[in-house]
Structures are given as C-alpha cells and as structure tokens.
C-alpha cells in the first residue's frame, strides 16, 4: 500500500450535469429501466386489463362494475349478509330439506337477534317429524349459511281455523280446543 492519495479527475474534465428538462428525461429513463428490471410494468398492464374501466387516476366507488359485484358490495356495506343468506335458504327450501318435507313444512320467518328460524307444518305429524330432524337440519343450514347463523329451529303446528262468529260459538270461549290435523 502506498501513502499517495488516489488520483481524482480534474474539474475541467468532468461531464456537464444535466439540468431542467434533460434531468427529468434522465430520471424518467432510469425509473423505467428499474421498473422493467423488477417486472412492475408488465404487472401493471395485466392489472389494468383485469381492472377494466376506471373513472379517474385511481379506482373508486364510482367505477363501472358488474351487477353481482355491486349487489354484494351493497350487502356487505349494509351488513345484510345473514338476512340475505337466510332469504336464499327460504327460496331453496326444497333443495335443503328434501321434496317430501318441503311439501308439508314451510319456513315462516327468521329472527336475526335470536338466530331462530320458525317453520310451520301443515299437520301435527309433520311437525313432530321435523322436531325429530331439527338438530340435523340446523347443522345443514349452518353448513350452507355459515357457522352459528341458525341456533334454533322453532317448529309450529298447523294454525286452527278462526271461529269467532257463528252458531257453534259459545260467548266468552277462547276458540277451538283441538282442531289440529
């Protein structure tokens, strides 16, 4: 090793530093080369093609979107996922419980706070059958809707006919005692 300092080029032999527009061009060229080396440009082009049309520089809520995506976004924003899912189950009731049971038992309402699905049957025999199948049915509903959506299946028998007036009506009575089918 020698104690002599390294030779530095003299200031008069330096290349001139770019300024203004030239400096901007040099910086842009360097940024493009670095992005190309990382692969960002190709990735951005793929994302632009996938993303579709946009209304401005960034994607926002006003951009065009598919109807299904817009409905899903609305359900998520309003917190309607569970009621919408239960409504879907009420529409798909025959596929979930089977054709025989669906002919005789119909879902009436869903209490979101208590997570109780109320089902009405057209005879006491079918109501008893559904009460026996309730644990399996709750498990199947939770499998379709998400865990814990339905905690209890409330089974109601058939509604008796309303007999408020007529020759067989006793004044002050509470109605028919046993008219279940």
From Swiss-Prot:
Residues 1-64, 156-181 are annotated as: Disordered. It comes from the Bacteria. Residues 30-39 have a biased composition (Basic and acidic residues). Residues 1-10 have a biased composition (Polar residues). It holds the Pfam family DciA. Belongs to the UPF0232 family. This is UPF0232 protein SAV_4320. It comes from Streptomyces avermitilis (strain ATCC 31267 / DSM 46492 / JCM 5070 / NBRC 14893 / NCIMB 12804 / NRRL 8165 / MA-4680). The lineage of its organism: Bacteria, Bacillati, Actinomycetota, Actinomycetes, Kitasatosporales.
């Amino acid at each position: 090793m020698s104690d002599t300092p390294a030779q530095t080029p003299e200031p008069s032999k330096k290349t001139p530093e770019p300024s203004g527009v030239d400096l901007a061009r040099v910086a842009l060229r360097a940024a493009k080369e670095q992005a190309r080396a990382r692969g960002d440009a190709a990735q951005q082009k793929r994302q632009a093609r996938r993303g579709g049309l946009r209304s401005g520089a960034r994607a926002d809520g006003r951009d065009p979107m598919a109807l299904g995506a817009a409905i899903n976004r609305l359900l998520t924003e309003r917190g309607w996922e569970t009621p919408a899912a239960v409504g879907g189950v009420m529409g798909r009731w025959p596929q979930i419980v089977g054709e025989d049971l669906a002919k005789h038992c119909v879902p009436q309402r869903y209490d979101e706070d208590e997570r109780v699905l109320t089902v009405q049957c057209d005879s006491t025999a079918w109501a008893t059958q559904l009460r026996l199948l309730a644990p399996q049915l709750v498990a199947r509903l939770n499998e379709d809707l998400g865990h814990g959506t339905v905690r209890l299946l409330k089974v109601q028998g058939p509604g008796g006919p309303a007999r408020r007036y007529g020759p067989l009506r006793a004044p002050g009575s509470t109605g028919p005692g046993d008219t279940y089918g």
